[in-house]
Amino acid sequence: TINAEDYGVTEVMVSDPCYDSDSFYNRLYEVLSGNYNCLIRKNKFGNWGVRVQSMAILHTDFEFDFLNKGGYLNGQVAVDSGTMSICDCAYYDKHHINDKDENELDEEWYNKNVCAWACRKNYHIANKLGFISSSGFGDGMYDVYTYSHNGEIVGVEVVFISDEDDE
């Protein structure tokens, strides 16, 4: 569970965790504060084996169906590391150096939260401020869906493999 209320989170970053905060991301504003469940959907895909089909965060006061049923297509995000994250923006920015001369991420954070966990067991919750998952078949462009209530986002989903994909 991500506890957005304790930290006053109202913005989230949807991004490959190896990207700086200026590259191929989707920054979402007006996110409802509160507790969020972190969810992944896995399925078996032939010779590929079991893969993460989608990842999502969902406010504990709400429900929605996986795989963009009723969600708003809010854009796409790129993956180059085989992983995806949904994180508090301030938490994400803290671990990603972003200026003209330097563009790098906090290697200790990356190794602890991405390499050691997400790559080994398909997902990881980082300090209750971020959710990291492996990304289906790996690198590519993926759809981001949002679910709203009274003008505030209460759910975010990244779909790596749709039900129609037959890879």
What are these regions (language model features)?
Residues 1-167:
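Intrinsically disordered, low-complexity acidic regions enriched in Pro/Ser/Thr
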